[in-house]
């Protein structure tokens, strides 16, 4: 991990990568979905907790279920995308810590602490969702993350037992570059950073 990636790779992951809202008809295959997860799973989470859970919504039936909870401004985006990922978290993630972090007991620090469980799960599943976006870009896909949906309705539809809870949605596929908006600016270093 000692070398800097070449500029074309950095462009693909960050500098030239765009958030897509329109998509080509090229499908996202099972092999691609597996490759995507097999990349993102290696990225760091607190105590290797890996609370993120991912539901890859592709079928017309599953899309129809999902669209019931999507904000009106996002409906067409989800319809057009070959795959929409529900980035969720497992409220019982800590039960797997003996397997995921065998070096010492991390599970007991969460037992009986629902606020800590929720805070840790939300933060780290959001991290894993960001890793999903980078993994998608690394594999030549595009991504379009969204937070405009009814969490309660979605969770009732897809996670009725209450164990998993939704964090955000992310369309993935092969974006239609001709339908991109002009690139929006970003904050300058001086506006967003402090060095102490």
Swiss-Prot record:
EC number of the protein: 1.-.-.-
InterPro entries found in the cross-reference section: Nitroreductase, Nitroreductase-like, Nitroreductase_HadB/RutE, RutE-like
Report keywords, A-Z: Flavoprotein, FMN, NAD, NADP, Oxidoreductase
Q: Cofactor(s) for this protein? A: FMN
- Enumerate the NCBIfam families for this protein: PRK05365.1
Natural source organism: Rhodopseudomonas palustris (strain TIE-1)
Name by which UniProt lists this protein: Putative NADH dehydrogenase/NAD(P)H nitroreductase Rpal_4764
Please give the family membership noted in the entry.
Belongs to the nitroreductase family. HadB/RutE subfamily.
Query: Which is an annotated GO molecular function term of this record?
Result: oxidoreductase activity
